[in-house]
Amino acid sequence: MTGKKLKEGFTTGACSAAAAKAATRLLLKGKPILEIETTLPNKRQVLFTVKRCQLEGEVATCSVVKDAGDDPDCTHGAELTARVRLTKENEIKLKGGDGVAVVTKAGLGLEIGQSAINPIPRKNIKEMILEELQGSSFNGAEVEISVPGGQEMAKKTMNERLGLIGGISILGTTGIVKPYSTAAFKASVIQAIQMAKEYGIDTIVLTTGGKSEKFAMDLLPNLNELSFIQVGDFIGTGIKTSVKESIRHTIIVGMIGKLSKMADGVMMTHRGGSSVNTTMLSTIARSIGVPEEIAIEIQNANTARHVLEICKVSGYKIITTKICEIVAEKCSKHAGTNIMISCYMVDFDGKLLGKCENFSPNVGLNL
């Protein structure tokens, strides 16, 4: 790939953790903090510039401005602010303040009424504070994360539709924002598949991100590392390039949100560009014998993850396999030629939920 190298950015979660760590250090040292080094969820060390640094008695407030890199979204430039007070208790109490959404609907992996600070950023924030507290006389802290202007930013997101009210969400599984939605990233997907072919690899694994790639590697440990390719939202590009490069077997590994979009025939899965079709998912549910009242509940679900929760509770987990079958069939049609496709669905911990193996238009399904 030629041209400018893409610049990565940082998630709202990573910036919040940096701000919280800086505020904790300010309380312990009593000196202005200009920069703070933190460890991201992916274990990478990063140095952040601290914008706001304010000490008022027992409370410190620090902020870090989000740089989304070469894939800026509506939170690019957001000032992630942490207000911290240290305590003697063995607990870090974390809540969202102004500009951080509150959860009002199920299906998001967070309790209703809780601030929309996702589990991995929540863990990272606490870890960074505890790192600073080592060797001090304090054991815990009360932390509030806020985002000035967060309510306005949220209007440009799907938060309100998802039941996230009053601001943005604090997100990020790795701490890094990869520029998936750029033309240059699309080019890198093509290049990665071409490279795999050059090395004699005839089975590739297309994943939607770093987390699903790690899970895919755990599921398929015998494959060459070059077989695993992060396609981001460009699943369609990955399929078409596999055909062009005469790849024998293409495996897709993802979680229910992205796979549900693929089952709906969407081959460019950016969350801002398409939403999950719960009507389609309810139709799939009916096809496997789900009672009508549950099918209606699925149709009214908040997210694809919510659909999964409904199916688990009602005992119809087989829907995950059915989704994988449809994904394999839709991707095969998108390929436009005879190509063998498999699809694996994993949960957020990497557990295999469903699969369709070796689908081909000529042989059908081999489950």
Curated annotation (Swiss-Prot):
Keyword Transferase tagged: yes
Its EC number(s): 2.1.1.195
Disulphide-bridged cysteine pairs: none
Reactions accelerated catalytically: Co-precorrin-5B + S-adenosyl-L-methionine = Co-precorrin-6A + S-adenosyl-L-homocysteine
Keywords, sorted A to Z: Cobalamin biosynthesis, Methyltransferase, S-adenosyl-L-methionine, Transferase
GO molecular function, one term: cobalt-precorrin-5B C1-methyltransferase activity
Membrane-crossing residue ranges in chain numbering: none
GO biological process, one term: anaerobic cobalamin biosynthetic process
Pathway annotation: Cofactor biosynthesis; adenosylcobalamin biosynthesis; cob(II)yrinate a,c-diamide from sirohydrochlorin (anaerobic route): step 6/10
Pfam families per record: CbiD
Protein family (similarity comment): Belongs to the CbiD family.
Protein name: Cobalt-precorrin-5B C(1)-methyltransferase
Gene encoding the protein: cbiD
